[in-house]
């Protein structure tokens, strides 16, 4: 039986609808860039690569032609085949957990298991409405680009922008602000592809 995504997301949508409506979806235009060979950037990139497992929490706003919602999220990443994304509301006990274990996606809510599938990306789109490459999400949240693709470094010596195709979709990202931790890590990220916008606000980092 195919479960409708609206059933799971309605309480989550209601709790953060205003956040979704006020998303700043415009790319910054006044950013100045520096070379990829900048020593400070290269040192930062080396430190990012040493972070193998981590967790973070925050807010996620999503806009497409068919969907518009926002939710709190909890991201727990162990390795490329084991990670979990939990969507939740502060106004109700409703949660939606998207967990990948050994490359198989398991979907559950606060009442128990719902579905499992080998095609994680397809299941995520079917149930939640987001067409998001979760296998890339771990690097994107860290601010770590694919070095073989197009990306740009800002004058603050941190990743500012990337643009490259994933699964026949051109994805662009703009890193709007960073937490000034011992290791600077992203705070606000704007992700876009054709017909989709994803605004991420990361509140907490643990690694």
Swiss-Prot record:
Q: Which UniProt keywords apply?
A: Cell outer membrane, Chaperone, Lipoprotein, Membrane, Palmitate, Protein transport, Signal, Transport
The biological process GO terms on file are: lipoprotein localization to outer membrane; protein transport
Role according to the record: Plays a critical role in the incorporation of lipoproteins in the outer membrane after they are released by the LolA protein.
Q: Where is the lipid attached (S-diacylglycerol cysteine)?
A: 21
Return the SUPFAM superfamilies for the record: Prokaryotic lipoproteins and lipoprotein localization factors
The protein's topology relative to the membrane is: Lipid-anchor
Q: Which domain of life is it from?
A: Bacteria
Write down what this protein is called.
Outer-membrane lipoprotein LolB
The UniProt record lists lipidation (N-palmitoyl cysteine) at 21
InterPro entries tied to this protein: LolA/LolB/LppX, OM_lipoprot_LolB
Task: Please provide an example of a Pfam family that matches this protein in its UniProt record.
Answer: LolB
**Species whose genome carries this gene:** Pasteurella multocida (strain Pm70)
